[in-house]
């Protein structure tokens, strides 16, 4: 297994050296850089990534593409703001709806139609009249997360109720995740849109993700024009990771800690090249 891992990493590093193209790293946050926890507010990046990310931005482009709000990401990655970098470093929140530099000085937001935001508020009102006491309601500003990690048995009735409501509230979509349903405006961008845009700046990319929201990126990087110059790494939880993700990645790790070791190994090979 380690031989196979080294072979894949070495092939990517050697190809990067041969063509002389710049390399960028793109990471999801929850489940990728940070272990999944029962309460979203308690999620924190694995400590192994602190020195790794410092090392990355000293030599490579870095992007964090997450479903989290940009304010949350700015807080999590503020330790990088004091480090000078000559490379592109950008945070993308709400799947790319908003983005920022590390200092929060240049926050940009895409336009969400007012009608969709009104429907989102109507969904909130309908939720208040429902009785799912086991569900933690997360207000993310331009989307809502309905977390049922404490009661996985209600996934089916909760999902059915959300689908029923969204059938009446045209302009909203449901995004399933690990023990969560996210309700968002239909015009909210997806991660693959953001990554596709980033690839126009950084031709060779290492992407790591763990959930349904990352599936589009894994599929994108499988396309012929990307597969030879990109490396996709899945962080898999055997009980929660969708099968489709395992079928579309180049490498699979079992935890954020293991991912950190793989990235460290890859950085060593890239530095040699």
Predicted regions and their residues:
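Conserved acidic, metal-coordinating active-site core of Asp-based
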Residues: 130-221, 228-230
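Non-catalytic pre-domain segments flanking phosphatase-related domains
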Residues: 1-29, 33-38, 48, 55, ...
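Residue-level marker for buried hydrophobic side chains located in beta-strands
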Residues: 25-27, 91, 206-208
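Active-site phosphate-binding/coordination module
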Residues: 36, 44-137
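Alpha-helix termini
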Residues: 14-17, 78-85, 222-228
């Amino acid at each position: 297994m380690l031989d196979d891992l080294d072979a894949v990493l070495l092939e990517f590093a050697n190809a990067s050296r041969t063509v002389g193209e710049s390399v960028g790293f793109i990471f999801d946050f929850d489940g990728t850089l940070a272990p999944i926890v029962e309460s979203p507010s308690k999620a924190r990046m694995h400590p192994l990534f602190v020195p790794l990310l410092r090392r990355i931005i000293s030599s490579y482009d870095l992007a964090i593409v997450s479903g989290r709000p940009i304010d949350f990401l700015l807080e999590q990655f503020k330790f990088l703001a004091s480090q000078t970098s000559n490379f592109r470093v950008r945070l993308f929140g709400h799947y790319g709806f908003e983005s920022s530099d590390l200092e929060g000085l240049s926050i940009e937001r895409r336009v969400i139609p007012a009608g969709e935001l009104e429907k989102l508020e109507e969904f909130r009102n309908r939720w208040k009249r429902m009785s799912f006491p086991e569900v933690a309601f997360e207000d993310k500003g331009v989307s809502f997360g309905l977390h049922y990690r404490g009661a996985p048995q209600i996934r089916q009735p909760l999902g059915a109720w959300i689908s029923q409501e969204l059938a009446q509230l045209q302009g909203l979509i449901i995004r399933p995740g690990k023990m969560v349903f996210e309700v968002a405006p239909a015009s909210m961008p997806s991660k693959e849109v953001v990554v596709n845009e980033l690839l126009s700046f950084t031709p060779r990319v290492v992407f790591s993700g763990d959930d349904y929201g990352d599936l589009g990126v894994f599929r994108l990087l499988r396309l012929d024009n990307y597969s030879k110059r990109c490396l996709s790494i899945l962080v898999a939880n055997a009980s929660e990771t969708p099968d489709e993700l395992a079928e579309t990645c180049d490498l699979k790790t079992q935890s954020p800690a293991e991912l950190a070791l793989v990235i460290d190994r890859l950085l060593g090979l890239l530095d040699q090249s």
